[in-house]
């Protein structure tokens, strides 16, 4: 199970939001490249980057910061936030992004996910952000009637690399991940699931590892994203990575 540090970009800075509220943000750094380098040096094998301005604008906004992160690290980078078209995907891949996350558009226009997977095989993940089990879109500002698990199952034959599942009620709260909901997602669909939201300490990583599978359907929880906990010093990234590696072995 990969331990993936998160860099959320707002106005070119690294921030963390509380429950996805753009007005409740803490600025941690004005140097995204240096922040990415720091996490990579602690052993991260992948970087999770979100363009928060992009999520609301409907197109990526923080291109300079994304380029700075790419220049600073050699590990793969996955990026989400405001990706709505195949043209935008191509631009991001040209910038050096390795994997792209389709969020709101996956709920609004599922067919685009299939086309994207066909055009960029192995490089497309779907971000499913849920509030009480229902999919939220447009930077979490709107909750739909779509069931999160049903949306994941819709893409089983698309060639989606991973589902990034976020429980909005936990995000940025340090109250622990929603292990049960993440496990349900992985047990119900056949696409590997990355857990996101609420991680606060090593015990949370342990709980996810203990529930990571593989399940009878062959699927598993393949990773966990951590943000606020590593920025606040509550979780030692290197220790979390070491724990995961010991578990895998």
Curated annotation (Swiss-Prot):
Pathway membership: Amino-acid biosynthesis; L-histidine biosynthesis; L-histidine from 5-phospho-alpha-D-ribose 1-diphosphate: step 4/9
Transmembrane feature ranges: none
InterPro entries: Aldolase_TIM (IPR013785), His_biosynth (IPR006062), HisA_bact_arch (IPR006063), Isoase_HisA-like (IPR044524), Isoase_HisA-like_bact (IPR023016), RibuloseP-bd_barrel (IPR011060)
Entry's Gene Ontology BP terms: L-histidine biosynthetic process; L-tryptophan biosynthetic process
Name by which UniProt lists this protein: 1-(5-phosphoribosyl)-5-[(5-phosphoribosylamino)methylideneamino] imidazole-4-carboxamide isomerase
Active-site residues, Swiss-Prot/TrEMBL: 8, 129
Organism: Magnetococcus marinus (strain ATCC BAA-1437 / JCM 17883 / MC-1)
Record's keyword terms, sorted: Amino-acid biosynthesis, Cytoplasm, Histidine biosynthesis, Isomerase
Compartments (UniProt record): Cytoplasm
UniProt-listed Enzyme Commission number(s): 5.3.1.16
Highest classification ranks of the organism: Bacteria, Pseudomonadati, Pseudomonadota, Alphaproteobacteria, Magnetococcales
């Amino acid at each position: 199970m990969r331990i993936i540090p998160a860099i959320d970009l707002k106005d070119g800075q690294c921030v963390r939001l509380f429950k996805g509220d753009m007005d409740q943000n803490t600025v941690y750094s004005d140097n995204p490249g240096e922040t990415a380098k720091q996490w990579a040096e602690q052993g991260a094998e992948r970087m999770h980057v979100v363009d928060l301005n992009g999520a609301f604008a409907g197109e990526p906004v923080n291109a300079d910061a994304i380029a700075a992160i790419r220049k600073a690290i050699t590990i793969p980078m996955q990026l989400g936030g405001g990706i709505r078209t195949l043209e935008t995907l191509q631009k991001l891949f040209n910038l050096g992004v390795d994997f792209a996350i389709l969020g709101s558009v996956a709920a609004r226009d599922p067919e685009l996910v299939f086309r994207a997977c066909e055009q960029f095989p192995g490089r497309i993940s779907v971000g499913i952000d849920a509030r009480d089990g229902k999919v939220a879109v447009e930077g979490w500002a709107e909750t739909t009637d779509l069931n999160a698990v049903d949306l994941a199952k819709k893409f089983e034959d698309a060639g989606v690399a991973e589902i990034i599942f976020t429980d909005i009620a936990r995000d940025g709260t340090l109250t622990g991940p929603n292990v049960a909901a993440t496990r349900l997602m992985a047990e119900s669909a056949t696409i590997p699931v990355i857990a996101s939201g609420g991680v606060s300490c090593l015990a949370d990583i342990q709980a996810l590892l203990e529930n990571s599978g593989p399940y009878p359907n062959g699927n598993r929880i393949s990773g966990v994203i951590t943000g606020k906990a590593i920025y606040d010093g509550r979780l030692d990234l290197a220790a979390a990575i070491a724990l995961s590696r010991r578990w895998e072995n």
